[in-house]
């Protein structure tokens, strides 16, 4: 099923990219365990990594620090490798409240969670691809270091069906129930099956657009066919099919029975300890809760919070690391840690926070001590499990530099010839008035400005001051959620306003080519917001514009400022020299404004490989902002016809999507007229 990695790009490596690709590949082939790619903003780091993957033909996991960046990377990798398995593995919780106990108020908080169906399907698709194929790139968040089902048990539970196989209908249904598929003859959806005579329809848990039809004759599999679950149209007939479990946490019955005995033994030992310490209430609570869970496991094969017994279910010893996504990655796999200066500290912090909460639950009799082994990986365990690793960052941390032995692969020259911003240091006394005049110069030529302050109060006051002086300004702060944050950044790029004020605007990986000025107020106040790495990241936000400039307001030059200025000047010098030698004129990036949220929320839709008649007649896209009234009118008529067509085909979701798009277009038409 695997194909060779085939890179799809109109561009060839240029600037520092060819040398970076060569050095990274040589390092991997020489067996180097750790390498660091220091790639400046806008130098095409993702393209470099895609070239390395394509040249070496190795399965790869890319770790990103958050869901937003993971979605952005997933979209880019999907474009680079359209014919290969590019998968997305992040936490499937839209909302998650872990169980916790607060002793001071005697409050127990039950676990509460809301699971995103699309992301759950994509996680299952990711592990399936890793088990079946070599041409796989999985883009993951730090969710990858959390416990997952044991790959050996997961493989044992699979149901293999082949044409001509002797198996009766009841045996298939029993196996599907073991895989946690539910029978539903009315609503056919992911992770369910239905039975009609001697035909069983199965909707695989990892699929979003294809289902399996098993036609039996007597006790023999007569035909296997793939069909569209929406229209029922047969897509193809196949000789064999493997059905994967509905969840990563399925366990064979014999393993559950064995685990129950081990849980009973631990319960007896723990009860004894609690009684010896005169903790009668805790002993009673633990006994009641554990026996209820055991009863559920005996009857149903699982219980609420079964992950707390994962050590027994996977047959691990006390303190052993849990199985994670790393266990699904082949031994010769490659790990790429994106924005490593943020991701690596995150990995280190996950275990400690989880441990503190669980210790309280164990101490007060809500959980058995074995629940402590349902946890993310410790940092040392992550290091031991990680295959050959490439750390990617514009500002690598000390850990990455130390692991790479100080041998860093530089990617400083951009293919576009763009230079790092010019840096100026100006006095604090006149910073606000000076900033106002700089903003007016930029706004006049349709360029944008980012301003970063040290405190929330200062950001609010500055925003108010700029508004009073007639500037179009918005304020970005920690109370704004991810969705609204991305909308604000999109509006800045579209020119809805000119200035964005914030406290920590150095969000890694954000592409804003329209920003030509970054102003850093109180740059001489040492601290984590004004450290060398923070300053370089913030300055880098203006590196995608031909007129990029950074103004640091400070009365003295701190060591962090000196290092940041020195590093930026080193890069700028190297870039200028390269441009002169190769006759390159810097060109601004004309990058279209893509709504990253649409990618994050509807990410599963990009996986559709074509669905026969059920395929939407129109894919909802971003409404073009520069259409003439005549073109808008034409587009409206076209979409109205398509909407009616969808409604006639009973495809109401697609019709509703077009209806929403029509609202936007009509508003634009009225404004343009």
Curated annotation (Swiss-Prot):
Q: Where does ATP bind?
A: 39-46
Q: What is known of its domains?
A: The beta-hairpin motif is involved in DNA binding.
User: Metal-binding: present as a keyword of the record?
Assistant: no
Q: SMART domains from the entry?
A: DEXDc, HELICc
Which residues are in the Helicase ATP-binding domain?
26-415
Taken from the record, one Pfam family name reads: Helicase_C
- Which intervals hold domain Helicase C-terminal? 431-597
The protein's name in its UniProt record: UvrABC system protein B
Annotated segments matching region Disordered: 608-627
Where would I look for the motif Beta-hairpin in this sequence?
Answer: 92-115
UniProt-listed InterPro entries: Helicase/UvrB_N (IPR006935), Helicase_ATP-bd (IPR014001), Helicase_C-like (IPR001650), P-loop_NTPase (IPR027417), UVR_dom (IPR001943), UVR_dom_sf (IPR036876), UvrB (IPR004807), UvrB_inter (IPR041471)
Q: What is the lineage of its organism?
A: Bacteria, Pseudomonadati, Pseudomonadota, Gammaproteobacteria, Enterobacterales
* Name of the coding gene: uvrB
Function per UniProt: The UvrABC repair system catalyzes the recognition and processing of DNA lesions. A damage recognition complex composed of 2 UvrA and 2 UvrB subunits scans DNA for abnormalities. Upon binding of the UvrA(2)B(2) complex to a putative damaged site, the DNA wraps around one UvrB monomer. DNA wrap is dependent on ATP binding by UvrB and probably causes local melting of the DNA helix, facilitating insertion of UvrB beta-hairpin between the DNA strands. Then UvrB probes one DNA strand for the presence of a lesion.
What's in the keyword line of the UniProt record? Answer: ATP-binding, Cytoplasm, DNA damage, DNA excision, DNA repair, Excision nuclease, Nucleotide-binding, SOS response
The question of whether Nucleotide-binding is a record keyword is answered with yes
Q: Any one Gene Ontology biological process term?
A: SOS response
SUPFAM superfamilies given in the database record? C-terminal UvrC-binding domain of UvrB, P-loop containing nucleoside triphosphate hydrolases
The record ties this protein, via PANTHER family, to:
UVRABC SYSTEM PROTEIN B
